[in-house]
Structures are given as structure tokens and as C-alpha cells.
Amino acid sequence: MERKDRGKLFRMYVTEQFVQSIHMTTQDRRITKTRKAIYQAFLHLLNEKDYDIITVQEIIDRADVGRSTFYSHYESKELLLDELCQKLFHHLFERDDQLSPQDYLTHIFQHFKKNQDHVTSLLLSKNDYFIRQLKKELEHDVYPMVAKKLIQSHPNIPHSYLKHLVVTNFIETLTWWLKKGKTYTEQEVIQFYLEILNVASN
């Protein structure tokens, strides 16, 4: 094959790859836009009603997409809930090592308050999946911060019970505050919580 022909084939190959990359970029944008529309529709519906009574058809109608389009992105509304939990908890439980337990727990309360439009209904309705995921995060990130003092203060109490106490009390405290305790600041409520656990800093 002559050099001229090889050069022509190379230019054709480069052109084809460029066209394909543009097509993929456009397709990726379309996919991202569609997923965002579905996700936002889901959030808006959570602002209006409990998760359990939201239907896939309502999400489809609100997002203005076809049924086949919805199912090409999400197999069920449960996967939407899973994505919500992942996005929420990823930021929620990020921790700066310089933060004290009080400041870290205050950050969690503030984040729930900031996202309460689509989170409060899940929390207050005690959605099973949401609560299970929240408990896992609290066990992993919150309990270790207070475990040492608790175990020292209550050496005869099983660690599993202490962990259960920390996690369930946190959820109940957060629920109480979101429902009827907002006359108190996040910092004040966290102080109540830590004092009840007897691990507050002096």
C-alpha cells in the first residue's frame, strides 16, 4: 500500500473516531439529563407524599419520560431510593478529623434540616430501607466516637446493647427535633443527646 493511501486511511480512521466520540458525548449528556429528570421527579414527589404510596407511573408522569425509558435507567423505585440514600449519606457522614463529636453530630443535624423536604418523609414515616441504611451509617461513624466513654462508664453492659442505644437514641432525637423541637438549636439538641448518654464534654 502506498504512503498516500495509508495517509488517507489514517485520516478516515481519525475522522470516524472523532464522530463516534461526539456521538458518545451527546448520548452521555442525554442519559445524564434523563436520569436527572427522573431523580428530581422522585424528590418532588417525596415532598408531597410518603414513599410507600408513590408509584412508578407518577414518577414517569412527573419526569415526562416513557415507561421503557424509566426502566432503562432504574429497575424499580427502590433503586431510586437507594441512589438517594447513597447521595445523602455520602456527604452526611463525611468527617473532618479535626471536628469534635459535638460539631460532627451538629453537622449531621444541619444536613438533615437542609434536606428535610425529601428526607423528613422517609425518616418520619420510618421507611424500612432508609432507616436500615441510616442505622448502618450511625453504627459505623457515630458509635465509635462515644463508645470508649460509654464502655468505661458501663463495663458490665454488652457492647451490642450500647451500640443499639446510641443509634436508636440518635434517630429518635433527630425525629423529635424535626417534628417539634425546632425551638432548640442543633447544638442544644446534640448537647441534650450527649448528656443523656453521659458522654458530653465538660
Residue ranges of predicted features:
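Short amphipathic alpha-helical segment with a characteristic S/N-K-E followed by hydrophobic residues
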Residues: 38, 53, 65, 76-81
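Append "Primarily bacterial transcriptional regulators
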Residues: 38, 57-62, 70, 112
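Short hydrophobic/aromatic patch on the recognition helix
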Residues: 64-73, 170
